[in-house]
């Protein structure tokens, strides 16, 4: 056996062997059900970063453990390959985005292979390939047939740089595009939507079933769905009793305190309600607001601006006339596009009232309410009604119900549940996306492409400018087609789908990747779904994860699958952070190579002190670490061990080169340990243990089964990979502290066999190499997970700490079952007591059974 651990010599060799032996090919589950481990598939940028490494290695460990436990494991990989980055890169380089993407996929696949991931590449999918997006189009038509896909004119978020429409979720809190960073504008366009709001209640209620998801993610989804209970209230226009404005409120108990009704600037009633003398100012305000994004308009920090329309409505509870305003903070597609302003009991309404001198009427009384309102604040807590006529004296909860019921009897109110969730906008005016399989006919309207004509294939080799709407509009040979219904000239839909459409069902295709008749069979989905362990970033909590849940529920209702939730357990791994050097006065980052003294770093240009931070790795911050460089220097197993050991999976990980070196040294220790035992072991076949066991054998055997128990526990429910590796270190220490020469052959075999099998999911190449060095005939990854022997955990004796006046002075071995009196007697009779007490009896003895005895002179 080579005395030197050389990862470069063995890792590629074993990867080749595993591929040739089909080690990672997915077997059909013998019991009808397998274990599905899945990482969120990546966009193929062409370059693997450490965030990728962490995600995929975590999933790989879980997959390998489940295989060793005897499960049929599905562990696939694919590529979320459509989208703006590829199209923009193609425009910049004047290349075809398909060719660009395919090259990147090849490059990233080879990088993933170097990590030793146990991926079944036979199931690989790329969303940009027509044999995949054919089925994305097929599923779109299923949703269309079910009334879940529809087209309407809508105010949309327009990215002026990428020149495409963005979903609300793709606009950040500053009103900027999540991709380009441009300030988002508002435009009216005819767009395709998916009716996700039809599933709002199910999406919210079924979060309670997802006990294997982080509470944080479930809370984020619940808040995004945003269930509100209240009432819709009709306010009659004073000058036209046949016209009413419908307002939704969660606080019907404050209705008597309304001082105005506020409409969205683009509410359909604004033009008819506006008085002639207010038309100019209203139209100017409408034009100004149209340039703002929804987030800019609704930000808590933004001023609340509006104009009076000249109209009034009647409060149905007390008949009081209320002015009708329009304001920037009211959105036409949220609720009813109208709100009632109650300045005394809503902080936003209070700010608006203060700006425009509107009345403030308190109608909720509680301790401190009057003082808060007098001080210019709104009292938003419940209380007892005042100034509310017949409802005075009721508490808020009862008043909500009574006022709503009264309004229902009078015909001006109805109890209502609403949701913050909006329908999913999927139209994109770009080229590199899945074509929407619809043909627009002047006579027949929107006609679905017949399923036998799918896929609608993207034309290749076209000129991309990146500007001016969809490039597909310019492809006349592609656009102009006969109507499938009447045969008359018609045009294809030139919008492409949001890339989240492709990623909302890919986990289903992996279950049946070669099916040419349908996207997946019900039988295949039932064998593998739901995904038992899904791993990905917290940034996908609202977008991808919510859309995937919607897709799954919709497809179940269409009769295509039987599962209602796609992912049983979810692990959201933390970010990988690197050291950054930042000049606080300029905000600029300095590359580590330009920092002469990392202990007291200074700006090489100005000499100013730099602040040292740990931040998410990125090129702009000069703190990225190339996985290939780490593998070249230390090997894939060391990279894996570091990324798993440095922090719990869900926490952020701070990169530290010295800790990488530490993991390499640990693997070297295991190499040397096996090397020292190599001459004593020619096979790993178990041998009969001598009885009774020698003390050294018993001690090591107990350490073996403590490790099996602890590592198995760490990999069971709460995935704690870092503490599992700590247990491997403890077992290694237990073996080396005794020494292989002091162990019987049977216990030595058991120790090394167990160590290598526990190590195999974490450092698969090293474990495989050492397994074969010790005589293993098949792969360690097929050797089975070690079985716990509870009897080995039973101790005849334990180490008892002896303290003198609170200071540890040594340990003695005592019977594990000794009681307090026996422990005190053994401690007093020990050499430690004789030395430190010098023949004097202690004034006090403190006994902690099984742990320590403290003798106080």
From Swiss-Prot:
<keyword id="KW-0067">ATP-binding</keyword>
<dbReference type="Pfam" id="PF00133">
    <property type="entry name" value="tRNA-synt_1"/>
</dbReference>
<dbReference type="GO" id="GO:0005524">
    <property type="term" value="F:ATP binding"/>
</dbReference>
<dbReference type="Pfam" id="PF08264">
    <property type="entry name" value="Anticodon_1"/>
</dbReference>
<feature type="short sequence motif" description="'KMSKS' region">
    <location>
        <begin position="616"/>
        <end position="620"/>
    </location>
</feature>
<dbReference type="InterPro" id="IPR001412">
    <property type="entry name" value="aa-tRNA-synth_I_CS"/>
</dbReference>
<protein>
    <recommendedName>
        <fullName>Leucine--tRNA ligase</fullName>
        <ecNumber>6.1.1.4</ecNumber>
    </recommendedName>
</protein>
<dbReference type="InterPro" id="IPR014729">
    <property type="entry name" value="Rossmann-like_a/b/a_fold"/>
</dbReference>
<dbReference type="InterPro" id="IPR025709">
    <property type="entry name" value="Leu_tRNA-synth_edit"/>
</dbReference>
<dbReference type="GO" id="GO:0006429">
    <property type="term" value="P:leucyl-tRNA aminoacylation"/>
</dbReference>
<dbReference type="GO" id="GO:0004823">
    <property type="term" value="F:leucine-tRNA ligase activity"/>
</dbReference>
<dbReference type="InterPro" id="IPR015413">
    <property type="entry name" value="Methionyl/Leucyl_tRNA_Synth"/>
</dbReference>
<dbReference type="InterPro" id="IPR002302">
    <property type="entry name" value="Leu-tRNA-ligase"/>
</dbReference>
<keyword id="KW-0030">Aminoacyl-tRNA synthetase</keyword>
<dbReference type="InterPro" id="IPR009080">
    <property type="entry name" value="tRNAsynth_Ia_anticodon-bd"/>
</dbReference>
<keyword id="KW-0547">Nucleotide-binding</keyword>
<keyword id="KW-0648">Protein biosynthesis</keyword>
<dbReference type="InterPro" id="IPR009008">
    <property type="entry name" value="Val/Leu/Ile-tRNA-synth_edit"/>
</dbReference>
<dbReference type="InterPro" id="IPR013155">
    <property type="entry name" value="M/V/L/I-tRNA-synth_anticd-bd"/>
</dbReference>
<dbReference type="InterPro" id="IPR002300">
    <property type="entry name" value="aa-tRNA-synth_Ia"/>
</dbReference>
<keyword id="KW-0436">Ligase</keyword>
<feature type="binding site">
    <location>
        <position position="619"/>
    </location>
    <ligand>
        <name>ATP</name>
    </ligand>
</feature>
<dbReference type="Pfam" id="PF09334">
    <property type="entry name" value="tRNA-synt_1g"/>
</dbReference>
<comment type="similarity">
    <text>Belongs to the class-I aminoacyl-tRNA synthetase family.</text>
</comment>
<dbReference type="GO" id="GO:0005829">
    <property type="term" value="C:cytosol"/>
</dbReference>
<dbReference type="GO" id="GO:0002161">
    <property type="term" value="F:aminoacyl-tRNA deacylase activity"/>
</dbReference>
<feature type="short sequence motif" description="'HIGH' region">
    <location>
        <begin position="42"/>
        <end position="52"/>
    </location>
</feature>
<dbReference type="Pfam" id="PF13603">
    <property type="entry name" value="tRNA-synt_1_2"/>
</dbReference>
<keyword id="KW-0963">Cytoplasm</keyword>
